[in-house]
């Protein structure tokens, strides 16, 4: 995505530079289209960069949330020094649950930071808020089950109902985790769509300008 955006910015610069055929005196970061419209390349570049940076930050949060699916595979396991890598160790999942809990706290903190970014659309802020709400719901549910989850000897069954989204019970956090997964998927799509929208707006203006270059 970043390479694509850099290439687009360079293309825009070259095309708009070819449009600078007189007109008002321009600043170093401005170009003029043939119809006299002055374009600020610095603002254009920043708009693309801001959208790209936001999408990249959302992707980081998305990766953290999805990592819990991998962590859940360690329920009832311990490392083994052979090609099998793991062996069973039932009902000792306290540290694993604490680790997942910390991941979601980190997710919540990152979402709070994303909410405070100036310039993102109200739609994206709403999407961020929805993901944050689901992360808080998971934290609240896990805390409410502290009798079963806030100890070293968390049983495999209880651990699964907390962090395994395919578990049949899902009464200790897994149900909230499913909602969080759905919400972060939707936010990532919205963030990527925002980048594509900015790119389409700018490339459309370039395509509209190109025919005049042959006049």
Swiss-Prot record:
Coiled coil: none annotated. The keyword Ribonucleoprotein does not apply. The keyword Kinase does not apply. InterPro entries: Lipoprotein_OspC, OspC-like_sf. A lipid is attached at residue 19 (N-palmitoyl cysteine). One of its GO terms (cellular component) is cell outer membrane. It is found in: Cell outer membrane. It is a lipid-anchor. It comes from the Bacteria. Residues 1-18 form the signal peptide. Keywords: Cell outer membrane, Lipoprotein, Membrane, Palmitate, Plasmid, Signal. Its main location: membrane. Pfam families: Lipoprotein_6. A lipid is attached at residue 19 (S-diacylglycerol cysteine). The Vlp and Vsp proteins are antigenically distinct proteins, only one vlp or vsp gene is transcriptionally active at any one time. Switching between these genes is a mechanism of host immune response evasion. Belongs to the variable small protein (Vsp) family. Genes for both Vlp and Vsp families are on (usually) unnamed linear plasmids in B.hermsii HS1. This is Variable small protein 3. It comes from Borrelia hermsii. The lineage of its organism: Bacteria, Pseudomonadati, Spirochaetota, Spirochaetia, Spirochaetales. The gene is vsp3.
């Amino acid at each position: 995505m970043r390479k694509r955006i850099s290439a687009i910015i360079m293309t825009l610069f070259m095309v708009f530079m070819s449009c600078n055929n007189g007109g008002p005196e321009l600043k170093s970061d401005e170009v003029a289209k043939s119809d006299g419209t002055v374009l600020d390349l610095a603002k254009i570049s920043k708009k693309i960069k801001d959208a790209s940076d936001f999408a990249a930050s959302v992707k980081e949060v998305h990766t953290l949330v999805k990592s819990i699916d991998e962590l859940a595979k360690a329920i009832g396991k311990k490392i083994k020094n052979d090609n099998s890598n793991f062996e069973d160790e039932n009902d000792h999942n306290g540290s694993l649950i604490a680790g997942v809990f910390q991941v979601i706290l980190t997710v919540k903190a990152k979402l709070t930071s994303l909410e405070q970014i100036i310039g993102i659309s109200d739609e994206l802020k709403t999407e961020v808020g929805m993901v944050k709400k689901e992360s808080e719901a998971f934290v609240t549910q896990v805390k409410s089950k502290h009798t079963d989850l806030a100890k070293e000897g968390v049983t495999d069954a209880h651990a699964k109902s907390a962090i395994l989204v395919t578990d049949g019970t899902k009464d200790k956090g897994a149900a909230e985790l499913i909602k969080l997964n759905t919400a972060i998927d939707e936010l990532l799509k919205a963030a990527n769509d925002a980048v594509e929208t900015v790119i389409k707006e700018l490339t459309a203006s370039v395509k509209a300008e190109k025919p005049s270059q042959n006049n």
